[in-house]
Amino acid sequence: INWKAIIEAAKQAL
């Protein structure tokens, strides 16, 4: 699992 991708997606989801 790419945590960076998840974190980036979460930031954009904000």
From Swiss-Prot:
GO terms for molecular function: toxin activity. Mast cell degranulating peptide. Activates G proteins (G(i) component), which in turn activates the cascade of molecular events cAMP-regulated, resulting in mast cell degranulation. Keywords: Amidation, G-protein coupled receptor impairing toxin, Mast cell degranulation, Membrane, Secreted, Target cell membrane, Target membrane, Toxin. This is Protopolybia-mastoparan-II. Coiled coil: none annotated. It comes from the Eukaryota. It is found in: Secreted; Target cell membrane. One of its GO terms (cellular component) is extracellular region. Belongs to the MCD family. Mastoparan subfamily. Expressed by the venom gland. The keyword tRNA-binding does not apply. The modification Leucine amide is found at residue 14. The keyword Protease does not apply.
